Amino acid sequence: MTTPAKKRLMWDFKRLQKDPPVGISGAPQDNNIMHWNALIFGPEDTPWDGGTFKLTLHFTEDYPNKPPIVRFVSRMFHPNIYADGSICLDILQNQWSPIYDVAAVLTSIQSLLCDPNPDSPANAEAARLFSENKREYNRKVIEIVEQSYV
């Protein structure tokens, strides 16, 4: 039986295939529409440029009324990404709206890479370096980008 959540996710997947945002891809895992793998490519002309970052998205039957659980699988160094890969992003929490689809979620995460919020840190060291020593922060990001090739 196709539930409203599964119908919406099928629509999201078709839209993502038909009109993918630049630097983003995603698809259901093993033909399970409720679990997705995604890739975000680091935006050009940023320290993230050239990186390929893997994520997982897990949806419940409450989608789109509740946000997916999104985690980076790739190792990250970012003020708003926890050590376990979970992401501190308002639209994945208290600012969620059913109008957001998978493409909007992934685009927002891609934007967060370049525009972190150091006032809401998930990684205190990354937030401190971002605010106080941008050169060292960028060096650590470039290390992460190089590791993402593997």
From Swiss-Prot:
It is an enzyme of class 2 (transferase). Residues 4-150 form the UBC core domain. Pathway: Protein modification; protein ubiquitination. It catalyses: S-ubiquitinyl-[E1 ubiquitin-activating enzyme]-L-cysteine + [E2 ubiquitin-conjugating enzyme]-L-cysteine = [E1 ubiquitin-activating enzyme]-L-cysteine + S-ubiquitinyl-[E2 ubiquitin-conjugating enzyme]-L-cysteine. This is Ubiquitin-conjugating enzyme E2 3. Keywords: ATP-binding, Nucleotide-binding, Transferase, Ubl conjugation pathway. Belongs to the ubiquitin-conjugating enzyme family. SMART domains: UBCc (SM00212). The active site is at C88. GO terms for biological process: protein ubiquitination; ubiquitin-dependent protein catabolic process. Accepts the ubiquitin from the E1 complex and catalyzes its covalent attachment to other proteins. InterPro entries: Ub_conjugating_enzyme, UBQ-conjugat_E2_core, UBQ-conjugating_AS, UBQ-conjugating_enzyme/RWD.
